[in-house]
Amino acid sequence: MYPPEFSYVRAESLQEALKFLEGNDNTRPLAGGQSLIPMLKLRVLSPDYILDINRLNELNYVKTSLNGVSIGALTRYHDILSNDIVKSKVPLMHHATRTIGDMQVRNMGTIGGAISNADPASDMPVVLTALNATIILSSASGSRSVKALDFFKGPFTTDTNKGELVTQIEVPVLDGYKTVYKKVVRRAGDYALASVALAIKLKGNEIEDIKLAYGGVHDKPFRAMEVEKNVIGKKLNDDLVKDIASKVSSQINPPSDHRGSSWYRREVVKVLTMKAFKEVA
């Protein structure tokens, strides 16, 4: 299907992009296009303007900061995957990025585009929710920060106001944590039927801290905060893991579609949870 008609505008600087967004409501920024182009072809979106931001090199970086690791919104998955800072300081993000799409998607797709699209089955929103990352949104009048847990509001819906653009992601460094990312897909390159991102800090075999998030099984990334709170201080063993898997499965609200039923996704979550904990035990 052909996309609807729109006007194409290319920004040469961040300030130019923000000024344009401020004055033109029905505008969609174009970064890698891996999410936007398919949605245009399906006519899910019908913007008046497409704002090409690919020349905004000031949004393409990975660097250490006081808050951990800062990543520019235009940083492509390929660059995240090959970056030594991400490998050493945010291994959960590195592991998840390896599983995203195929080489074309990783070469073109950007972290900012993925989280702005907010597909509940997408990989990066789940990772950022588990890591308690912060999203920086900029507009012509200034910037503000939103926790990932609050940024994703529902399917393809975020806490982005008129005239705002995602410009940076700040990811805490979790020293002393073991991390793992797992997902089930129908075929290579697909969005996840279900996914789990786990970061856990152990003292011996006792859980000192835990962060547990799921994708593809709720209307947005699901952070199992009630489960997290209840298992801190407990010894990690098979019985506890089975209990965690069962409780998470009862708390999620998976969709049923052509890729899998709600029941099937709940069962997948149980299996993924047990596999994730087995890997970090």
UniProtKB/Swiss-Prot annotation:
Q: What is its EC number?
A: 1.2.99.8
Stretches assigned to the FAD-binding PCMH-type domain: 1-176
Q: Which GO terms describe its cellular component?
A: cytoplasm
Q: Which cysteines are joined by disulfide bonds?
A: none
Q: Which InterPro entries match?
A: CO_DH_flav_C (IPR005107), CO_DH_flav_C_dom_sf (IPR036683), Diverse_Substr_Oxidored (IPR051312), FAD-bd_PCMH (IPR016166), FAD-bd_PCMH-like_sf (IPR036318), FAD-bd_PCMH_sub1 (IPR016167), FAD-bd_PCMH_sub2 (IPR016169), Glyceraldehyde_DH_medium (IPR053586)
Q: Where in the cell is it found?
A: Cytoplasm
TM ranges are: none
Q: Which reaction does it catalyse?
A: D-glyceraldehyde + A + H2O = (R)-glycerate + AH2 + H(+)
* A Pfam cross-reference name: CO_deh_flav_C
Q: What class of enzyme is it?
A: oxidoreductase
Q: Tell me, in one coarse class, where this protein mainly resides.
A: cytoplasm
| Binding positions for FAD per the UniProt entry | 31-35, 110-114
Q: Which keywords are on file for this protein?
A: Cytoplasm, FAD, Flavoprotein, Oxidoreductase
**Self-association or partners: how does it assemble?**
Heterotrimer composed of a large chain (CutA), a medium chain (CutB) and a small chain (CutC).
Q: Which NCBIfam families match?
A: glyceraldDH_beta (NF041019)
What is its biological role? Component of the glyceraldehyde dehydrogenase which is involved the nonphosphorylated Entner-Doudoroff pathway. Catalyzes the oxidation of D-glyceraldehyde to yield glycerate. When the artificial electron acceptor 2,6-dichlorophenol-indophenol (Cl2Ind) is used, the enzyme shows a broad substrate range (glyceraldehyde-3-phosphate, formaldehyde, acetaldehyde, propionaldehyde and isobutyraldehyde), but is most active with D-glyceraldehyde. It is not known which acceptor is utilized in vivo.
Q: Which named protein is this?
A: Glyceraldehyde dehydrogenase medium chain
